[in-house]
Every structure is written in C-alpha cells, then in structure tokens.
Amino acid sequence: MELTQEDYIIICGDFGLCWAKDKTFEYHCKNFAEKPYTILWVQGNHENYDMIGEYPLEEWHGGKVRHIIRDKVILLERGQVFEIEGKSFFAFGGASSHDIQGGILDRQTVDFAEQKRRADRAHLPYRILQESWWPQELPTEGELQEGLRNLERYHYEVDYVVPHCCG
C-alpha cells in the first residue's frame, strides 16, 4: 500500500528530527519534504525544546501547531484538540526523563567536570541541561489547564488521545 498526500503518520514523541541544525537535519528536511504524506508528532522527553521553540505557533485544524517542515512535518502542541478527517484528536506530549540517574548536569556550574566524572565512573546515565535535557519535557501548569479547557469544550470525549507516555 502506497501512502498518499491524504495520509497522516502520527509519531508519539522522541521523533529525533529536531535535535541539531546540522547536515543530518538538512537531509531529513529535504527527504520529508518530498514525501506525499504528512507527519504529525507530539513532543517526547528527548527533544531539543530550544530548537522547537524557534518555530512559530500557528493554528491548524483547530489547535496550535508548529510547522517544522512546511506542511509535511507538523508538531501538535500539548493540550490541543484537532479535527482531522471528521475525528477529534487530543494531543499531549512530553514525559519525565528516566535516564538521569547520574543527574542533570549544568555546564555553568563550577563542579560540572567533577559531576560528569563521577557519573561516568559509576556508569550512570545523565543528561546535560540545554544540550540533552530541557525542563520543557514536562508540561507546565498553563499547558495542563489549557488541555483541560480544550477537553471541556468536547465534553471530555475525543476520538483519539495522542500521548508520548501513558505511565
């Protein structure tokens, strides 16, 4: 079965596209732009939220989105309800990172090198603030409230829920 311009692929977070504006990103942008289908995705806990934030918020099918690659790759913002082909979709991406037993390290702290060395020696996974971990991985109170208001408009009944994590 061939996918067409009428088709959507939904990715439930950790897409990996928005990580760094490098040759890999450029390659994927060109590749996805040539596909007939549209990719819709919600944030995961492993996204570069600074990079995502560079794209303007827009309205699309009743909710807020960011067009990452024109009309081919579209980020569905948290707490939004979208009407697509006669069905309602509630998007709520994000999650708490589980691979941070070694901590969330900040290069700006004076003991960064020592913290990193300790985590490396203990073989504990860690993330680095604004490089491999962003506080925006978790929803804000505003996003939670907006999601509740949007669900209330639908009497808390939507056809599909698109999360990243259900735990």
Please place each PLM-identified region on the residue numbering:
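Core catalytic region of metal-dependent phosphoesterases/phosphodiesterases
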Residues: 1-84
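Active-site-proximal loop/helix segment associated with metal-binding centers of metalloenzymes
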Residues: 85-167
